[in-house]
Amino acid sequence: MGLPWYRVHTVVLNDPGRLLAVHIMHTALVAGWAGSMALYELAVFDPSDPVLDPMWRQGMFVIPFMTRLGITNSWGGWSITGGTVTNPGIWSYEGVAGSHILFSGLCFLAAIWHWVYWDLAIFSDERTGKPSLDLPKIFGIHLFLSGLACFGFGAFHVTGLYGPGIWVSDPYGLTGEVQPVNPAWGVEGFDPFVPGGIASHHIAAGTLGILAGLFHLSVRPPQRLYKGLRMGNIETVLSSSIAAVFFAAFVVAGTMWYGSATTPIELFGPTRYQWDQGYFQQEIYRRVGAGLAKNQSLSEAWSKIPEKLAFYDYIGNNPAKGGLFRAGSMDSGDGIAVGWLGHPIFRDKEGRELFVRRMPTFFETFPVVLVDGDGIVRADVPFRRAESKYSVEQVGVTVEFYGGELNGVSYSDPATVKKYARRAQLGEIFELDRATLKSDGVFRSSPRGWFTFGHASFALLFFFGHIWHGARTLFRDVFAGIDPDLDTQVEFGAFQKLGDPTTRRQAV
């Protein structure tokens, strides 16, 4: 047939049996990739430290998606929350991976069967005997079934009525666990950070899908609409399906990048806006302030800050700090976090507390500037020492640590003070192991960043695909010069004007 690579899909254009076969094979590939990727991630994942080396620091991509749907245990005897388990059951991480691979194999066999047995009676119109699909009826069937699945997920899986529930956490990603969720039917259900909205929206959308599916199964489209939207053409199905997919891809790119109840920070890492707004820093200071109000010392108040909360307040966990083309996990960038050194408090020789100005997200380097409580610059690490007025040496800056491994330790020698001032630009200070993975010290993005970039890119690509195929199906007669209602068999190339026997070509 000699088709160029970008035209090969025409072979299934008028062949419903093999069109079904290639779609089943596509499902086999998707499910097979998911299962294989899960097994690979399980082979390299280290579950030993869920606080300082969580899945998102290790670059896990499919494990977070399994976890948010209620999978927490492994046949290896470990739990994602750090404990050990004796009876993980069939729906463990390995169980889900295995079921996807098994499903992939069955789809592979089904695809081969449908490719071989393509000429089934169900695909032919009994009136004409030609291959034919009742596309509006198929649309109704698919809408009904997807509505049923959507309703079932919201009403049973998410609510825990028949299923585990979903991953739910507090606003600071500290207490996450899988638990049943009650539907939120009030206005709070529209808050993207309220898990109850996931249940209620799936129930509502599923109900709508079931009713719409039944409608399309029982009501035929008007003839004008059928012809106007080219409902008899399979390319119309392709175009509208691409539209649904790119719309969904844009939505999930948004919920992932900006954060929502569906993308918990314990599973996918923090968002860049939490660094930009000092989200975790404010909560840490609030907790310290509450401790001081209870007559705790600074050391006691800072020692009560969870290491997990302090770790979120570190720029290396900001997904926007990794370049788009820096491959690898966060751990292979700045290293594996080993421990929190504590919170450094800087003071000048007059006893004023100084605060290091933090590095904004899109800077690679940033001047080290220390300001007092009123925002007045009191010290810095100058670029040109000859003209310096606020250098650490001149101002007499010292640093003392509260909480963490260096609790109670203070330094006054300028070199050490400057070292910790530079590190304080990046948020809370952590000891990082760069030797184990040969980490190069260059920040990487988290799975949150990769997911967003991938889905936004493919959404844009699919948007153009929708326009392309929509235009092809709506203007097929214009592009091809063929009347879409032409029923007679015509021989391409026999006439100068297609289908007009008065313009028969002369044999050369």
Curated annotation (Swiss-Prot):
<dbReference type="InterPro" id="IPR017486">
    <property type="entry name" value="PSII_PsbB"/>
</dbReference>
<dbReference type="InterPro" id="IPR000932">
    <property type="entry name" value="PS_antenna-like"/>
</dbReference>
<keyword id="KW-1133">Transmembrane helix</keyword>
<feature type="transmembrane region" description="Helical">
    <location>
        <begin position="203"/>
        <end position="218"/>
    </location>
</feature>
<dbReference type="GO" id="GO:0009772">
    <property type="term" value="P:photosynthetic electron transport in photosystem II"/>
</dbReference>
<feature type="transmembrane region" description="Helical">
    <location>
        <begin position="237"/>
        <end position="252"/>
    </location>
</feature>
<feature type="transmembrane region" description="Helical">
    <location>
        <begin position="101"/>
        <end position="115"/>
    </location>
</feature>
<dbReference type="GO" id="GO:0016168">
    <property type="term" value="F:chlorophyll binding"/>
</dbReference>
<comment type="function">
    <text>One of the components of the core complex of photosystem II (PSII). It binds chlorophyll and helps catalyze the primary light-induced photochemical processes of PSII. PSII is a light-driven water:plastoquinone oxidoreductase, using light energy to abstract electrons from H(2)O, generating O(2) and a proton gradient subsequently used for ATP formation.</text>
</comment>
<feature type="transmembrane region" description="Helical">
    <location>
        <begin position="21"/>
        <end position="36"/>
    </location>
</feature>
<dbReference type="GO" id="GO:0009535">
    <property type="term" value="C:chloroplast thylakoid membrane"/>
</dbReference>
<keyword id="KW-0934">Plastid</keyword>
<keyword id="KW-0604">Photosystem II</keyword>
<comment type="subunit">
    <text>PSII is composed of 1 copy each of membrane proteins PsbA, PsbB, PsbC, PsbD, PsbE, PsbF, PsbH, PsbI, PsbJ, PsbK, PsbL, PsbM, PsbT, PsbX, PsbY, PsbZ, Psb30/Ycf12, at least 3 peripheral proteins of the oxygen-evolving complex and a large number of cofactors. It forms dimeric complexes.</text>
</comment>
<keyword id="KW-0472">Membrane</keyword>
<keyword id="KW-0148">Chlorophyll</keyword>
<keyword id="KW-0150">Chloroplast</keyword>
<dbReference type="InterPro" id="IPR036001">
    <property type="entry name" value="PS_II_antenna-like_sf"/>
</dbReference>
<dbReference type="Pfam" id="PF00421">
    <property type="entry name" value="PSII"/>
</dbReference>
<dbReference type="GO" id="GO:0045156">
    <property type="term" value="F:electron transporter, transferring electrons within the cyclic electron transport pathway of photosynthesis activity"/>
</dbReference>
<keyword id="KW-0157">Chromophore</keyword>
<feature type="transmembrane region" description="Helical">
    <location>
        <begin position="140"/>
        <end position="156"/>
    </location>
</feature>
<feature type="transmembrane region" description="Helical">
    <location>
        <begin position="457"/>
        <end position="472"/>
    </location>
</feature>
<keyword id="KW-0602">Photosynthesis</keyword>
<keyword id="KW-0793">Thylakoid</keyword>
<dbReference type="GO" id="GO:0009523">
    <property type="term" value="C:photosystem II"/>
</dbReference>
<protein>
    <recommendedName>
        <fullName>Photosystem II CP47 reaction center protein</fullName>
    </recommendedName>
</protein>
<keyword id="KW-0812">Transmembrane</keyword>
<comment type="similarity">
    <text>Belongs to the PsbB/PsbC family. PsbB subfamily.</text>
</comment>
